[in-house]
């Protein structure tokens, strides 16, 4: 049995998320179907580093899977890349250590969130950036986003009813820039893990701060109170990208 690690990207528009679901199209299902075809009917299960939601995209999702027969990595990558649907791309593939696990091996993730602030919006980007047509104070958001950096209990920024008990995570970097070509706002977050809908809830809160409907201190208030009701709304998933995953050696 040989374990393989692959980096994949996908356009999340037509997917109901990464993780396999009944009666819904998912990234996991499409890749597993292709692997089954490539291995003559073997049932192959893949494991992903992150479980992206419906409509969420990825530049650098990491998966692993086991095959009974050893394969040439580049030939396997090419076969998987060309036989999966057009909205999935297999960027790289290599043999991995037997104990490597895409999800549980210690790693850091980087997410990017794009916001189209154009009036009118760019219709060509409607699936790839969240539209926010209201006035924003970018400097105020850039000041507020700094409060997210560090080790905190992010209970106030996760979805209600999540089953995860330990909600302490470390964000190593959080920035907001504006793309000079498109004018889009680019929120970037790096850390050792993120809770369910955490990034989208942080962005939703920052947009409310930028619009003046929440004070600049609101990030700190949400972290201290652990109260989801004090945070902003959940931003739409179409602006979210799993950008990169880096594993510790």
From Swiss-Prot:
Catalyzed reaction equations: uridine(38/39/40) in tRNA = pseudouridine(38/39/40) in tRNA
Recorded GO MF terms: RNA binding; tRNA pseudouridine(38-40) synthase activity
EC number(s) given by UniProt: 5.4.99.12
Residues at which substrate binds: 111
Record: active site: 53
Keyword flag Lipoprotein: no
Domain of life from the UniProt record: Bacteria
Keyword entries, A-Z: Isomerase, tRNA processing
CDD domains (alphabetical): PseudoU_synth_EcTruA (cd02570)
InterPro entries to which the protein is assigned, alphabetical: PsdUridine_synth_cat_dom_sf, PsdUridine_synth_TruA, PsdUridine_synth_TruA_a/b_dom, PsdUridine_synth_TruA_C, TruA/RsuA/RluB/E/F_N
Disulfide-bonded cysteines: none
GO BP: tRNA pseudouridine synthesis
Quaternary organization: Homodimer.
Recorded family membership: Belongs to the tRNA pseudouridine synthase TruA family.
Job of this protein: Formation of pseudouridine at positions 38, 39 and 40 in the anticodon stem and loop of transfer RNAs.
Protein name: tRNA pseudouridine synthase A
């Amino acid at each position: 049995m040989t374990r393989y690690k692959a980096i994949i990207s996908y356009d999340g528009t037509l997917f109901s998320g990464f993780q396999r679901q009944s009666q819904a199209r998912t990234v996991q299902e499409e890749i597993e179907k292709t692997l089954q075809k490539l291995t003559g009917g073997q049932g192959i299960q893949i494991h992903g580093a992150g479980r992206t939601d419906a409509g969420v995209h990825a530049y650098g999702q990491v998966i692993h899977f086991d095959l009974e027969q050893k394969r040439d990595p580049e030939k396997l990558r090419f076969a998987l890349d060309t036989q999966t649907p057009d909205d999935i791309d297999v960027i790289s593939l290599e043999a991995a250590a037997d104990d490597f696990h895409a999800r549980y091996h210690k790693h850091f993730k980087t997410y990017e969130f794009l916001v189209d602030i154009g009036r009118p919006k760019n219709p060509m980007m409607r699936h790839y950036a969240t539209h926010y047509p209201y006035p924003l104070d970018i400097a105020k958001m850039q000041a507020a986003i700094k409060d997210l950096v560090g080790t905190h209990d992010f209970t106030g920024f996760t979805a209600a009813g999540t089953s995860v008990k330990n909600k302490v995570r470390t964000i190593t970097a959080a920035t907001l820039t504006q793309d000079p070509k498109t004018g889009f706002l680019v929120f970037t977050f790096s850390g050792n893990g993120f809770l369910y809908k955490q990034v989208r809830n942080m962005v939703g809160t920052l947009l409310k701060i930028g619009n003046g409907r929440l004070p600049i201190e609101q990030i700190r208030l949400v972290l201290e109170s652990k109260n989801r009701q004090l945070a902003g709304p959940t931003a739409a998933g179409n602006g979210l990208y799993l950008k990169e995953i880096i594993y510790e050696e």
